[in-house]
Amino acid sequence: MATIGYIRVSTIDQNIDLQRNALTSANCDRIFEDRISGKIANRPGLKRALKYVNKGDTLVVWKLDRLGRSVKNLVALISELHERGAHFHSLTDSIDTSSAMGRFFFHVMSAPAEMERELIVERTLAGLAAARAQGRLGGHPRAINRHEQEQISRLLEKGHPRQQLAIIFGIGVSTLYRYFPASRIKKRMN
């Protein structure tokens, strides 16, 4: 059961000593760090720390905002730790998910994020139902309509190159192959 520390400062110029001293005092076995904004999703130090964390271990940060800026991301990260059987501890915020009170606080904190996810799903389903009621189907609009499909089919059968047709119809060559696989095109002999 290791204690893994994570330090993050927003710029290279910021001093990490305060965080490092706090994590050292918390008896962290290993400390990982990033010198990057919390808004940036790709944080190599955090990735290494999360890879290092095993079941029964605890990820420790000096302050909650060092781990992430949005509640949604924090909830996802702490949930991932929980699913792996690991714990989370924020020193200055007094959050420790290894205790009943810490887990309770985490659940209270995660409730708004869960509600937001459910509201998004409800709005999406309501929008799709309204569209269906008006005769529209959900999803992306087709890249080419039926009339264009018929035109392209005739042109392909006459031997026109896909690259040329892609330019004319303003679509990608891969779209042409998706709609008209090479095995289905019969070239007419004139």
Curated annotation (Swiss-Prot):
Entry-linked SMART domains: Resolvase (SM00857)
Residue ranges of every copy of the Resolvase/invertase-type recombinase catalytic domain listed in the record: 2-135
Keyword annotations: DNA integration, DNA invertase, DNA recombination, DNA-binding
Origin superkingdom: Bacteria
Active site positions: 10 (o-(5'-phospho-dna)-serine intermediate)
Gene Ontology MF: a single term: DNA binding
Pfam family, one: HTH_7
DNA-binding region: 162-181
Cited InterPro entries: Homeodomain-like_sf, Recombinase_CS, Resolv_N, Resolvase-like_N_sf, Resolvase_HTH_dom, SSR_resolvase
Tagged with keyword DNA-binding: yes
Nucleotidyltransferase recorded as keyword: no
GO biological process entries: DNA integration
UniProt family annotation: Belongs to the site-specific recombinase resolvase family.
PANTHER family, A to Z: DNA-INVERTASE FROM LAMBDOID PROPHAGE, SERINE RECOMBINASE PINE-RELATED
Reported function: A DNA fragment of approximately 900 base pairs, adjacent to the fljB (H2) gene, which specifies the synthesis of phase-2 flagellin, can exist in either orientation with respect to fljB. The orientation of the inversion region controls expression of fljB. The hin gene occupies about two-thirds of the inversion region; it is required for the inversion of the fljB controlling region.
Name of the molecule in the record: DNA-invertase
Organism expressing this protein natively: Salmonella abortus-equi
Organism placement in taxonomy: Bacteria, Pseudomonadati, Pseudomonadota, Gammaproteobacteria, Enterobacterales
